[in-house]
Amino acid sequence: MSEACPSCGLAVAGGTDGCQRLFDSIGLREYEDMRFARYHRIVVDVYAMQHPDRYGRSAKSFAAHLTGLCTWLENEAGAQSVNASVQRWLSGPSPVARPPLPPSYGALTIRELVEAEDPARYGEALRRWAQSTWNAYASLHVTARAWIATSLSYGNR
């Protein structure tokens, strides 16, 4: 019997545990099939932003995943460099506070990826899921971009 994951709303056998199993199976696919591996970081970021009480408890963890989501959607080509800059900034004494969460985390869930068998469809499904999640965090777009800008200037010191 399906029950809803209380964080993302996915109806799945086992609720929270079932949702986590889907996430783990996606990670396994990315590990076993290199055609999907390039998406691993953003899959983790999107899933974390839909499960912030588990994967974004600390302000720094939350900031890393929110900025990762922002960067991938707005500057995919530069995402690796920006993410490295954010990581350096967050590894230092950065004064980051976890902001209030939105009331929901997007209409789409990790289920979008489950049936995408080829990398092109997987990428398209991932982009839809990521965009849905990012849209849910509209109130934090300015914050994410400010954190990115701060991290980039931090690296130039």
What are these regions (language model features)?
Residues 1-157:
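Intrinsically disordered, low-complexity linkers and terminal regions
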